[in-house]
Amino acid sequence: MEIRGIGFVGSHTTAHAAMGAFLRDVLGLTPIAVAGVGAALFAASNGDVLAVAPPYEEDGSKERTIGLIVDDLDGAIAELHAAGVETDGISENARWRYSHFRMPDGKLYELVEEQAGRG
């Protein structure tokens, strides 16, 4: 598996509106909309994405992640499974196909594959 880059970084906050305004108005990031994504997304000029979401639930089901870009999501998942790493099912939205997994420290990450024509 080859990690080509970081597709996005996600952050939880209770100051959702203030964070959005700061990212847009002060840092100059561009708001973007992606169908099927509940977080507010902001793009840097090189296309990197910062996601801002409400605080996660106590059970961690809304835990934010770092998305690692791969060219072949199915192949990358197979490599993780071969290494004994569990993943959840493949999900997708208008921009990415993705699957979550936990690093050795227990933190949630995901592998993301850009949808055709969206990279």
Description of each model-found segment:
Residues G28-V34, V85-I90:
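Short secondary-structure junctions
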Residues G7, V37-G38, R64, E86, ...:
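Residue-level marker for the onset of beta-strands and adjacent loop->beta junctions
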Residues M19-V26, L80, G106:
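Conserved active-site tyrosine of GNAT-family acetyltransferases
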